[in-house]
């Protein structure tokens, strides 16, 4: 599977990406001015330009190329356009003069072993603090634990109930009756205070 992109408005670079090939480096760099400057022009570029301009495109043969490869020379012949001496050799001809197959076309091939692999790691952390401190003064804390003190020796008749409220007559007129009812009333008040605190 290959992807070819030809941009005619820019310096005509088309790229083909081939998958599952043996080489992972750039295998071929050929074609127009970029390829010519690396493969076809001899160290004396000016002399080579004048030599190529002196011949018509039909007269260019394999011996005129830096390579004797027939496909390379065919690519030179099919893309050569005669220009003035100042512009040098131009291979920027129209697309119609190129061969129909990809072989010999102006292209930059990138051969990849396993295609393109993109690995991205996104690390993120979210910290939410829900600690709410309730400020309590020591005085409030102590006042909640302060319960009313009831004297067991109180002479108040409010703590003394009739015999029907006693434990089925088990505590009739005993000497601990007043202390018992005082303790029971205190326990009720403690229970009521606990309920209010909750």
Swiss-Prot record:
Subunit architecture: Homodimer. Interacts with VP1. Interacts with VP2. Interacts with NSP2; this interaction leads to up-regulation of NSP5 hyperphosphorylation and formation of virus factories. Interacts with NSP6. Participates in the selective exclusion of host proteins from stress granules (SG) and P bodies (PB). Also participates in the sequestration of these remodeled organelles in viral factories.
Organism the protein comes from: Rotavirus A (strain RVA/Human/Japan/AU-1/1982/G3P3[9])
Modification sites for Phosphoserine: 67, 154, 156, 164, 166
Cofactor(s) the record lists: Mg(2+)
Family: Belongs to the rotavirus NSP5 family.
This protein's record includes keyword Lyase: no
Residue span of region Disordered: 16-37, 53-72, 131-151
Compartment(s): Host cytoplasm
InterPro entries: Rotavirus_A/C_NSP5 (IPR002512)
Biological process according to GO: viral genome replication
Official protein name in the record: Non-structural protein 5
HAMAP family cross-referenced by the UniProt entry: ROTA_NSP5 (MF_04092)
């Amino acid at each position: 599977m290959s992807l070819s992109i030809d941009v005619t408005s820019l310096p005509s670079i088309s790229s083909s990406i081939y998958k599952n090939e043996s080489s992972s480096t750039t295998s071929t760099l050929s074609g127009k001015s970029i390829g010519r400057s690396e493969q076809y022009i001899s160290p004396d570029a000016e002399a080579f330009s004048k030599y190529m301009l002196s011949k018509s495109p039909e007269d260019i043969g394999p011996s005129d190329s830096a390579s004797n490869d027939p496909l390379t020379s065919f690519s030179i012949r099919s893309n050569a356009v005669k220009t003035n001496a100042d512009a040098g050799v131009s291979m920027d001809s129209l697309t119609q003069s190129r061969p129909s197959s990809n072989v010999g076309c102006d292209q930059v091939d990138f051969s990849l072993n396993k295609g393109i692999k993109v690995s991205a790691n996104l690390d993120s952390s979210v910290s939410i603090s829900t600690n709410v401190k309730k400020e309590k003064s020591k005085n409030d804390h102590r006042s909640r634990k302060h319960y009313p003190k009831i004297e067991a020796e109180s002479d108040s008749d409010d703590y003394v109930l009739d015999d029907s409220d006693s434990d089925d007559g088990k505590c009739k007129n005993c000497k601990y009756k007043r202390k018992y009812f005082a303790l029971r009333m205190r326990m009720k008040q403690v229970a009521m205070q606990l309920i209010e605190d909750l």
